[in-house]
């Protein structure tokens, strides 16, 4: 039997479960209100003021820094823009915005980093595959970077005040629409001079293309030697002269310090036989002794001295033409119009007695080029080469009464003995350049002093052998350098003599000056002693030295 009314009571477990459910609902609501209030009031006015002080303390400068930020032109949605920018601001404060420790700016950055860590719970994370979407590289000043950071915090505060859950929006679709291509707004560097590739053909370079100063070697030097002269402040003419064989080194354009580059004119040399097949050009050192008879027969009788009046050498030749003698058998003298860059090829035309004569032994044989004359089976061009001292091509017109050898006759080839006695011959006509006509006329006064003196009134003998000039294989550039005489010293020897002579002169002057100063001091000391010598005698002795010697006791 049960107690009365016991059947209408509820078990205690039922009331306990409902009570726990009510408590859970109240707790969840309070937690939600706390989270919303926490995100809405996360960013205070003090954080924005510290950012403004950070901006005001920066120095205005034109120096730009590189950083990655959101491209607002691609991402139009403001919520997605701030959601992407918030993650990038964290990286910027950690990597770019750095200050010295324990300074007000460094403390402000630490506070902002702590704020961004607390705000991270208010943002939902999107897919990682869109991390670089809508992001590009910016090149701006530090002030502009700080302005962007301040705007991000300010806009985030305004949106969180309106809706604390606004950044839970899914922005994957907006990020997918953006192109992840990184657009660079400015180039990394401004290259002033494009690098020129060294080429053996200067004409292939454009006239308007500037040369890089470090890539253009000095003319006449090898490529390894030109690299050693890059850091030197000497002009091309002041560099040590290096002789280079034209067959072993390619022709390279000279060093240019200007913006424009003019390709040098390459002299045209026709080297062929009657059949038209080109023959290999013999080297300078390899000279066949069997050619002595051929050269002697070709040059000994057909080339006669020029008239002694000197009228033929004074014929003015325009600068735009070059004299090109035709085949000896042709019997004609041709004047060909040349390009503006060509120069005068010869100082005087062929004499009239040389026309119509043809060598008998060299009709079908191509001869090697010796000196300034190279007879061949075909027509050939004559281009003189600049030497260290003026040769017969650049001499002044002789005085009346003194005959002169023709300018086109090879020097020292009148007899076979002189042919073997002169081993050093001209290397190549195409390896050097020719002085302009105006420069030749302007240097006549200096040529007279440098050229070897000739006997006054003595006629030049036709068979007399003149010493061959020492040719310089290194062509001079357009800087107008002085030519050296035959007996002059090399630049290294002159420099060493100068360095030895100046100290020796200074030492001699110092020695002479010291000797004079010593003599002057000695005289100045002797004069007071002579003046004080009468006073040094004792006052009580009226006798002189002679009297003392007389009165000595015996």
Curated annotation (Swiss-Prot):
Annotated TM spans: 497-517
Location relative to the cell: Cell membrane
Biased composition (Polar residues): 404-433
Modified residue annotations for Phosphothreonine: 266
Topological domains, Cytoplasmic: 518-554
Glycosylation sites: 154, 172, 309, 363, 365
Residue ranges annotated as Lumenal topological domain: 33-496
Gene Ontology biological-process annotations: branching involved in mammary gland duct morphogenesis; cell surface receptor protein tyrosine kinase signaling pathway; developmental process involved in reproduction; homeostasis of number of cells within a tissue; inflammatory response; innate immune response; macrophage colony-stimulating factor signaling pathway; macrophage differentiation
Regions of compositional bias (Low complexity) in chain numbering: 344-354
GO cellular component: CSF1-CSF1R complex; endoplasmic reticulum lumen; extracellular region; extracellular space; membrane; nuclear body; perinuclear region of cytoplasm; plasma membrane
Signal peptide feature range: 1-32
GO molecular function: cytokine activity; growth factor activity; identical protein binding; macrophage colony-stimulating factor receptor binding; protein homodimerization activity
Annotated Pfam families: CSF-1
Membrane topology (UniProt): Single-pass type I membrane protein
Effect of residue 309 to A: Loss of chondroitin sulfate attachment
Key words of the record: Cell membrane, Cytokine, Disulfide bond, Glycoprotein, Growth factor, Immunity, Inflammatory response, Innate immunity, Membrane, Phosphoprotein, Proteoglycan, Secreted, Signal, Transmembrane, Transmembrane helix
Biased composition (Basic and acidic residues): 440-453, 545-554
Disulfide bond entries: 39-122, 80-171, 134-178
Stretches the record annotates as O-glycosylated at one site: 406-426
Region Disordered: start-end pairs: 224-488, 526-554
Modification note: N-glycosylated.
Gene3D superfamilies named in the record: 1.20.1250.10
Associated clinical condition: Aberrant expression of CSF1 or CSF1R can promote cancer cell proliferation, invasion and formation of metastases. Overexpression of CSF1 or CSF1R is observed in a significant percentage of breast, ovarian, prostate, and endometrial cancers.
Known role: Cytokine that plays an essential role in the regulation of survival, proliferation and differentiation of hematopoietic precursor cells, especially mononuclear phagocytes, such as macrophages and monocytes. Promotes the release of pro-inflammatory chemokines, and thereby plays an important role in innate immunity and in inflammatory processes. Plays an important role in the regulation of osteoclast proliferation and differentiation, the regulation of bone resorption, and is required for normal bone development. Required for normal male and female fertility.
Subunit structure: Homodimer or heterodimer; disulfide-linked. Likely to exist in multiple forms: homodimer consisting of 2 identical 150-200 kDa proteoglycan subunits, heterodimer consisting of a 150-200 kDa proteoglycan subunit and a truncated 43 kDa subunit, and homodimer consisting of 2 identical 43 kDa subunits. Interacts with CSF1R.
Name used for this protein in its record: Macrophage colony-stimulating factor 1
Organism of this sequence: Homo sapiens
Taxonomic lineage of the native organism: Eukaryota, Metazoa, Chordata, Craniata, Vertebrata
Protein encoded by which gene: CSF1
């Amino acid at each position: 039997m049960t107690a009365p009314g016991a059947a209408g009571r509820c078990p205690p477990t039922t009331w306990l479960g409902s009570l726990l459910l009510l408590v859970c609902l109240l707790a969840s609501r309070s937690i939600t209100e706390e989270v919303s209030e926490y995100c809405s009031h996360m960013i205070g006015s003090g954080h924005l003021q510290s950012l403004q002080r950070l901006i005001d303390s920066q120095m205005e400068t034109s120096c730009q820094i590189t950083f990655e930020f959101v491209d607002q032109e691609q991402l139009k949605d403001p919520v997605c823009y701030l959601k992407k920018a918030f993650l990038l601001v964290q990286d910027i404060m950690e990597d770019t915005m750095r200050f010295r420790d324990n300074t007000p700016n460094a403390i402000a950055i630490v506070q902002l980093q702590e704020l961004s860590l607390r705000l991270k719970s208010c943002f939902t994370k999107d897919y990682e595959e869109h991390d670089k979407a809508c992001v590009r590289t910016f090149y701006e000043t530090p002030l502009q970077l700080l302005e962007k950071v301040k705007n991000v915090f300010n806009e985030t505060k305004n949106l969180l005040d309106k809706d604390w859950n606004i950044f839970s929006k899914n922005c994957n679709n907006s990020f997918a629409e953006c192109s992840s291509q990184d657009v660079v707004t400015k180039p990394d560097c401004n290259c002033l001079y494009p690098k020129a590739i060294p080429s053996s053909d200067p004409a292939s370079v454009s006239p308007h293309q500037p040369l890089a100063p470090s890539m253009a070697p000095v003319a006449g030097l090898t490529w390894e030697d030109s690299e050693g002269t890059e850091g030197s402040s000497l002009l091309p003419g002041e560099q040590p002269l290096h002789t280079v064989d034209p067959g072993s080194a390619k022709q390279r354009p000279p060093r240019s310090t200007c913006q424009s580059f003019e390709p040098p004119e390459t002299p045209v040399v026709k080297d062929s036989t009657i059949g038209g097949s080109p023959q290999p050009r013999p080297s300078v050192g390899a000279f066949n002794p069997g050619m002595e008879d051929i050269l002697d027969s070709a040059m000994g009788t057909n080339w006669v001295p020029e008239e002694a009046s000197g009228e033929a050498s004074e014929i003015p030749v325009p600068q735009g033409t070059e004299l090109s003698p035709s085949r000896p058998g042709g019997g004609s003298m041709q004047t060909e119009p040349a390009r503006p860059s060509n120069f005068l090829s010869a100082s005087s035309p062929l004499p009239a007695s040389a026309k119509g004569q043809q060598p008998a032994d060299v009709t079908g044989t191509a001869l090697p080029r010796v000196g300034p004359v190279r007879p061949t089976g075909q027509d050939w061009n004559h281009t003189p080469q600049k030497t260290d001292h003026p040769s017969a091509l650049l001499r002044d017109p002789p005085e009346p009464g003194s005959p002169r050898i023709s300018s086109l006759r090879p020097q020292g080839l009148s007899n076979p003995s002189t042919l073997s006695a002169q081993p050093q011959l001209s290397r190549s006509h195409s390896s050097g350049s020719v002085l302009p006509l105006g420069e030749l006329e302007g240097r006549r006064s200096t040529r007279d002093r440098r050229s070897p003196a000739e006997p006054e009134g003595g006629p030049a003998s036709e068979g007399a052998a003149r010493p061959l000039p020492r040719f310089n294989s290194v062509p001079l550039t357009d800087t107008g350098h002085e030519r050296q005489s035959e007996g002059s010293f090399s630049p290294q020897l002159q420099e060493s003599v100068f360095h030895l002579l100046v100290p020796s002169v200074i030492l001699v002057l110092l020695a002479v000056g010291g000797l004079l100063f010593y003599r002057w001091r000695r005289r100045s000391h002797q004069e007071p002693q002579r003046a004080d010598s009468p006073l040094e005698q004792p006052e009580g002795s009226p006798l002189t030295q002679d009297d003392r010697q007389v009165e000595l006791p015996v």
